[in-house]
Amino acid sequence: MRHRKSGRQLNRNSSHRQAMFRNLASALVSHEIIKTTLPKAKELRRVVEPLITLAKVDSVANRRLAFARTRNVETVAKLFNELGPRFAQRAGGYTRILKCGFRAGDNAPMAYIELVDRPEVAEATTEE
């Protein structure tokens, strides 16, 4: 019975799931917006939000905890140098999930997951 067992299995064993969420978390931190399936996005939120909360207090212990969870030096550097200070005044809710239709091959629901308050990319607009 699965009473009180939280989290989604996503048809993967535990090591595959852990590796997948490490990769997705690193991608989200580096790109600040990624497109994935809706269940993965909802589960990724449970991984990334505590990492950003950890990054709000810059200490060696917190950096080591973040590295243990992501296994990526660049991700840890961006978390503590950029994202921690950016979200210092926000008390949670660092990510936003936007549904974006269904995948062509298998009709899986897709979604964008992004960090809120991310800097807008200046689009090349030509004024005539």
Curated annotation (Swiss-Prot):
Keywords: Ribonucleoprotein, Ribosomal protein
GO cellular component, one term: cytosolic large ribosomal subunit
GO MF entries: structural constituent of ribosome
GO biological process, one term: translation
Keyword Ribonucleoprotein: yes
SUPFAM superfamilies documented for this protein: Prokaryotic ribosomal protein L17 (SSF64263)
Membrane listed as a keyword: no
Subunit structure, interactors included: Part of the 50S ribosomal subunit. Contacts protein L32.
PANTHER family hit by this protein: LARGE RIBOSOMAL SUBUNIT PROTEIN BL17M, RIBOSOMAL PROTEIN L17
HAMAP family, per the entry: Ribosomal_bL17
Record's protein name: Large ribosomal subunit protein bL17
Species annotation: Haemophilus influenzae (strain ATCC 51907 / DSM 11121 / KW20 / Rd)
